Design a protein with these regions (language model features):
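Mature catalytic domains of secreted/periplasmic carbohydrate-active enzymes
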Residues: 1-168
Length: 168
């Protein structure tokens, strides 16, 4: 018996998000978007998490330049918080422990976003209030504060400052 041990259902791709054993403390969805977990019959709170990588590999791959955009990673972070899940982001370090400049830049942008909007994702929990008409949008709640997350909001601008002018 080890009371300070955290048990996770990291059983591979077949058991993603499944509660399974009553002793579990957390379930993982691996690289699949989290879903609600039914805790009605659970004697305790069970955390959940989704894992993601900045590129196409879990570890360091010198020639892997297929980096995910910071916008996509931010959307995935927010999608995790929709269900109260944690977002684990991997950037494979090089042999000396440092990050490639491209990975460091992506993480830096996520850090900038979190500095601006972290209040909306750290403490708030799922509100249970549905947002009608937009499947991906959702509300989080922290006490009397609500945070609306809207996805797919295109930027419109004058043709002199945007690649695609409004209405095209």
């Amino acid at each position: 018996y080890q009371p300070d041990t955290i048990l996770i259902n990291n059983t591979g791709l077949e058991g993603r998000g499944q509660l399974g054993n009553i002793e579990l403390d957390s379930v993982t969805f691996e690289r699949v978007k989290p879903q609600p977990i039914n805790l009605a019959d659970s004697p305790k709170y069970i955390a959940s998490e989704m894992c993601e990588v900045t590129c196409d590999h879990w570890g360091y791959a010198r020639e892997d330049l297929n980096i995910k955009s910071p916008a996509l990673l931010i959307e995935e972070l927010c999608a995790c918080r929709r269900y109260g899940a944690n977002f684990l982001l991997n950037a494979g370090p090089m042999g000396d422990g440092s990050l490639r400049p491209i990975d460091a830049a992506a993480l830096g942008i996520l850090g900038q976003w979190t500095a601006l909007f972290g209040e909306s994702i750290h403490a708030p929990r799922p509100s249970g209030i549905a947002v009608s008409g937009r499947r991906r949008d959702f509300l989080l709640q922290d006490g009397k504060s609500y945070y609306l997350f809207c996805f797919g909001l295109d930027m419109t601008a004058d043709e002199h400052v945007a690649l695609q002018a409004a209405g095209e």
